[in-house]
Each structure stands twice: as C-alpha cells, then as structure tokens.
C-alpha cells in the first residue's frame, strides 16, 4: 500500500521513535513493524538488506527486545495482546492478553517487565511480567488512554502521553504507580529523552497533534519550557490527507546525547538540532514520488526513527512508500532506501551479544518516537 494506492483507492493507512541501544555487541539488527501487512522486517545495517522476516502477525505496532536478545516483543493491535517471538527462529512463543487495545511498548533495563501503553477503554499502563509472560497489573492513568510509553534511561520512570486527554504522564517504575501528570494544549505523541551526565532524565522532547515541530519538557521542573516549529517549505508535500493531525511523527536523540532528529510529513524531511542548545544544524530530504494529476510531490510519510549504536546512521520508516530510508547522519543525506512491507510503522534497534554470557544491556535510551 503506497501513497499512490491511498490516493487512487482512498484506502486509509493505519497510524504510524524507543528502545534502548546496547553499548557494544557483534551484530546489529533494525526491526520494522509493517502495520498494514502480516510481517516484521529485520534489516542488517551493514548490507542494508532485509535478512529475516517474522511472519503471520497482523496488527503489529510497537516493538522491543529482551536484554539478552533472545526475545522480540510486539504489541498486537489486532488481538490486543503482547506477542512474544523467539528472536533466532522468528517463531511465536506466546500471546499475552492485555487489558485492552495496545499501542507502543518499552522494556525495563534488566528486562524483568514490559510496559504497554493502553490506548482504548479505560487506558492506563499494562505491566507484563517477563518471567511468567502474564499481565501483572494495570496502572490507571486517571482515565488517560496512553499512546506512546518509554522507560527512562535510569530505569526509574515510565513516561507516556495521551492524545485524547492531551496529557504528559509519568509513572514510578519501582512503585509501579502513577507519579505525576502535566496537561498540554495538544495531543501528546512521540517522544525523545535527553539525559543528564548521571543518566537521569533532563528533558523530554514531545511531538504533538497538529504541530509540525515539538515541545520541550523540563523533567525536574515538570513544565514545558519551549516549543519549536520546524522550518517552512515553499510548498508542502502531498500525504494523501490522512495524516493532517500529526504532521511531525518520528523523533530521536542520538546515542551520544548530542543531536535531536525530528521528522516532518508535510516537509518530507528529517531535521537535526544540536543539543543542548537546540540549534538547527541540518536537513535531510526524504524520498518523494510524482503521480500524474497531482500538483504536489508525494511525501514518504516519515513515521518513526531509530539509530545504529554508533549514531552514524538513522533509519526512518516511510509509511507511505513501503520503505525505510537510511540516513548518513554526518553527511546529512539518504544513502539507501530499503523496501519493506505494507505501511511500515515502528522501528527499533537490537544489538545481539557476542556470546550467551554477554548481556545485551541497553545503553541509556536516547530516543523515542511517534504515534
């Protein structure tokens, strides 16, 4: 399902970067969920080719991994389950029933729990026990239906956002309880986390409904300190009209904590901002397509981002073009476009340890993103 098919047949695309990047290991893989297909593509970032497919999963959304790289966790919107796969074989281990319809997921640093955003019903945060693969509890969010959730790099909190309640939420991971919330004026979508020198959370950068840019949240002060709008373009790209309420969807902080990358659907680009000063340092144009009878070029519809552990490459899922763009972050250009499945949504980086004895303990999570 490309944007061409969306425009020609008016087929609505499913909606829609953040798992931690391990510090060192022998093999890196980029996982991409195909939200309108029935598979997950696994990319080798050395060859930039798909080297594995996890098949027979419809409704794949968020994706994360166990620290030892043995399991792949996927939130399944079709069955309202957390699907657990064997990483090597791609075979399903178990479908864990959740409290309601899920969205994004994240994993604790030691891998003992998987946290799942619940986007329907009463909402809240589901906690899945990784040892028993059962739903441990649901933490209420004062009626908030959560969209994206992320375990903070210091493993102390889970941060999340709600689109309908327009609220930024924080949960205490040790107590497994609601901590605090901050009302916003727009729906809260994708997030990225900037850390202090000690690994604690400094700022959260959050993309918002109807904002072609992002909000800046001071975590300690519990307040919004800035709002950044992405640069304008002479003419916006066509995106089929189905993502007008989420123009900026896909955001991430590089593993070295020095650069923030932000995508734009109408601008069809990814922008780089230096940290901590948030100065614009570059723009990368994403793939586009020309269709007869349409005045504008078609946007790739950037959806989510993830990095290689060294931060040299950025992978952008193009949900409108069944592909993933590989961006050289130093050269500021797309170096490869990799075909994947239908409406690629979330992507994530996995580093497989050298041996079974080497834990793939994630380095501080720098990125989070999109719907």
Task: Give the positions of each predicted feature.
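Cationic, low-complexity basic patches in intrinsically disordered or flexible, solvent-exposed regions
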Residues: 9
């Amino acid at each position: 399902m490309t944007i061409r098919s969306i425009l020609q047949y008016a087929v609505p695309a499913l909606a829609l970067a953040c798992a931690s990047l391990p510090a060192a290991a022998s093999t890196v893989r980029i996982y991409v969920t195909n939200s309108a297909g029935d598979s997950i593509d696994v990319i080798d970032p050395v060859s930039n080719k798909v080297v594995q497919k996890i098949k027979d999963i419809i409704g794949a959304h968020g994706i994360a991994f166990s620290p030892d790289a043995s399991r792949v966790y996927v939130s399944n919107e079709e069955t309202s389950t957390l699907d657990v796969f064997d990483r090597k074989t791609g075979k399903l281990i178990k479908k864990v029933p959740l409290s309601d319809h899920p969205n994004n997921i994240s994993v604790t640093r030691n891998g003992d729990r998987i946290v799942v955003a619940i986007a329907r019903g009463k909402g809240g945060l589901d906690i899945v026990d990784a040892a028993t693969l059962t739903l441990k509890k649901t933490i209420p969010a004062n009626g908030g239906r959560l969209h994206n959730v992320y375990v903070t790099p210091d493993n102390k909190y889970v941060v999340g956002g709600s689109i309908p309640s327009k609220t930024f939420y924080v949960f205490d991971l040790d107590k497994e309880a609601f901590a605090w919330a901050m009302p916003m004026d727009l729906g809260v979508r994708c997030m990225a986390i900037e850390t202090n020198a000690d690994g604690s959370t400094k700022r959260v950068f959050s993309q918002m409904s109807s904002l072609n840019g992002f909000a800046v949240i001071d975590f300690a002060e519990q307040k919004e300190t800035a709002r950044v709008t992405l640069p304008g373009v002479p003419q916006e790209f066509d995106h089929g009209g189905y993502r007008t309420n989420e123009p900026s969807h896909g955001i991430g902080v590089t593993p070295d904590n020095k650069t923030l990358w932000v995508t734009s659907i109408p601008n069809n680009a990814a922008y780089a901002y230096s940290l901590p000063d948030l100065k614009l340092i570059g723009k990368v144009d994403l793939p586009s397509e020309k269709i007869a009878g349409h005045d504008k070029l078609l946007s790739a519809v950037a959806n989510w981002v993830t990095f290689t552990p060294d931060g040299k490459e950025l992978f952008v899922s193009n949900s409108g073009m069944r592909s993933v763009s590989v961006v050289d972050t130093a050269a500021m250009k797309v170096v490869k476009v990799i075909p994947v499945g239908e409406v690629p949504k979330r992507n994530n980086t996995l580093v497989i340890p050298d041996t079974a004895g080497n834990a793939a303990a994630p380095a501080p999570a720098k990125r989070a993103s999109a719907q």
